[in-house]
């Protein structure tokens, strides 16, 4: 029986990569800076004391972080017995965004440059805005700028509810985001608007990675909240991922938990399970692992590390999330049977101590656990695609164009 379980702790970087300087991210270290803040007693809101991650540490997280950054994260046990394979990897892809990281994990690095809306005000071309107003029959639009998703709701949410004008905004990522109130604007109407935007961006040659529906609820500034009904409309990966190969070459199953299906534009996915929040994502993952058949991948993205704590620069929240994940990790490990492998990794960094609100260019951890996996140091990997190549080799698929297998 061969099954692989891939857990992406979204944004869980472990130290800036060699090329971080060109992204303005030299010195960033998501794990390291969280651990240091906890150790200094500066992250005691909702939790207390040094960062406590015994199960991730036993899989080699501390050792991988030390190899990446030169510093062992304070609070973790330097003398823990290592029961997993560990490594750290740098990104070959040109960006530090979610699709690039995930596609590269699945063996397909993004070697082209995404399009971006780089102007912080009046960010979108007028012809694009006019087209959206016309095609979607809109009374106008709000935003048209770079913004944090929560800040823009406080600024424009009330006006949106009154006027019916959707809020358009972007960031340093290759994204076009649309925020609308679930009740006054309507969720299905928001999704339909995002489909129109996706088509317009693709046909217009803007080369934008994702259109993101950002529904929210609430009745006044300070009370607006984004809901779990986010929907990402991504372009398709430029080549077959290891997920698609498993389905096409072996008739295998690929089960998406959380936003994985959206990230791969639903290509190479045979089942989708929606869940919102760390515990709910964990529960759904446990359920799918219990029933996953032979020749299957269960692939989960734990988005809260990025969206709730990384972008919002919430160090105590990120630390508490990591500790919750670590407490529940033995539930996943107990479901790993003979022939199975469990892979824990990330897609980029999002250092909550770093200036701004954007992702950070960092190494990612690669932690692998299973009865047939030799524990120990698997060194530095020069592309996330080593994960995809490992999966291709493990399942007996045709090799990927990039990456070297771990074993």
From Swiss-Prot:
Keyword flag Ubl conjugation: no
Lineage top rank: taxon: Bacteria
Pathway(s): Carbohydrate degradation; 2-deoxy-D-ribose 1-phosphate degradation; D-glyceraldehyde 3-phosphate and acetaldehyde from 2-deoxy-alpha-D-ribose 1-phosphate: step 1/2
EC number per UniProt: 5.4.2.7
Chief location of this protein within or outside the cell: cytoplasm
Stored InterPro entries: Alkaline_phosphatase_core_sf, DeoB, Metalloenzyme, Phosphopentomutase_DeoB_cap_sf
Keyword line: Cytoplasm, Isomerase, Manganese, Metal-binding
Biological-process GO terms, alphabetical: 2-deoxyribose 1-phosphate catabolic process; 5-phosphoribose 1-diphosphate biosynthetic process; metabolic compound salvage; nucleotide metabolic process
Gene Ontology molecular function: any one: magnesium ion binding
Ligase found in the keyword field: no
Cofactor binding note: Binds 2 manganese ions.
GO CC annotations, alphabetized: cytosol
Localization annotation: Cytoplasm
Catalytic activity: 2-deoxy-alpha-D-ribose 1-phosphate = 2-deoxy-D-ribose 5-phosphate; alpha-D-ribose 1-phosphate = D-ribose 5-phosphate
Necessary cofactors: Mn(2+)
PANTHER family from the UniProt entry: PHOSPHOPENTOMUTASE
NCBIfam families from the UniProt entry: deoB (TIGR01696), PRK05362.1 (NF003766)
Similarity-based family: Belongs to the phosphopentomutase family.
Job of this protein: Isomerase that catalyzes the conversion of deoxy-ribose 1-phosphate (dRib-1-P) and ribose 1-phosphate (Rib-1-P) to deoxy-ribose 5-phosphate (dRib-5-P) and ribose 5-phosphate (Rib-5-P), respectively.
Protein name per its UniProtKB record: Phosphopentomutase
Native source organism of the sequence: Erwinia tasmaniensis (strain DSM 17950 / CFBP 7177 / CIP 109463 / NCPPB 4357 / Et1/99)
Lineage of source species: Bacteria, Pseudomonadati, Pseudomonadota, Gammaproteobacteria, Enterobacterales
């Amino acid at each position: 029986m061969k099954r692989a379980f891939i857990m992406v702790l979204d944004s869980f970087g472990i130290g800036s990569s060699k090329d971080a300087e060109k992204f303005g991210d030299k010195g960033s270290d998501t794990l390291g800076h969280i651990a240091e803040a906890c150790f200094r007693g500066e992250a005691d809101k909702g939790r207390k004391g040094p960062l406590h991650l015994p199960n991730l540490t036993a899989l080699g997280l501390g050792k991988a972080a030390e190899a990446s950054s030169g510093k062992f994260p304070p609070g973790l046990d330097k003398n823990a017995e290592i029961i997993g394979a560990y490594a750290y990897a740098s990104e070959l892809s040109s960006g530090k965004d979610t699709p690039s990281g995930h596609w590269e994990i699945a063996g397909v690095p993004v070697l082209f440059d995404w399009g971006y809306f780089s102007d912080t005000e009046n960010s979108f071309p007028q012809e694009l805005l006019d087209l959206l107003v016309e095609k979607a029959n809109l009374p106008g639009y709000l935003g048209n700028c770079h913004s944090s998703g929560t800040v823009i709701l406080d600024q424009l949410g009330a006006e949106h509810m009154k006027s019916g004008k959707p809020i358009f905004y972007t960031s340093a990522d290759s994204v076009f985001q649309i925020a609308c109130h679930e009740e006054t604007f309507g969720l299905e109407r928001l999704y339909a608007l995002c489909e129109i935007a996706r088509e317009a961006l693709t046909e217009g040659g803007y080369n934008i990675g994702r259109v993101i529906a950002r529904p929210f609820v609430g009745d006044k500034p300070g009370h607006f909240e984004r809901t779990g009904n986010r929907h990402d409309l991504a372009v398709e990966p430029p080549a077959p991922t290891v997920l698609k190969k498993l389905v096409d070459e072996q008739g295998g199953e690929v089960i998406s938990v959380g936003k994985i299906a959206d990230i791969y534009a639903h290509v190479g996915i045979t089942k989708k399970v929606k869940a919102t929040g760390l515990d709910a994502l964990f529960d759904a993952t446990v359920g799918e692992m219990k029933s996953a058949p032979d020749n299957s991948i269960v692939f989960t993205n734990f988005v809260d590390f990025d969206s709730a704590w990384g972008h919002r620069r919430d160090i105590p929240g990120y630390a508490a999330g990591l500790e919750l994940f670590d407490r529940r990790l033995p539930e996943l490990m107990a479901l790993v049977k003979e022939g199975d492998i469990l892979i824990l990794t990330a897609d980029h960094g999002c250092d909550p101590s770093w200036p701004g609100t954007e992702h950070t260019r960092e190494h990612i951890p690669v932690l692998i656990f299973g009865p047939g996996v030799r524990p120990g140091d698997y060194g530095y990997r020069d592309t996330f695609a080593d994960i995809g190549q490992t999966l291709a080799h493990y399942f007996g698929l045709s090799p990927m164009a990039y990456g070297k297998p771990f074993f």
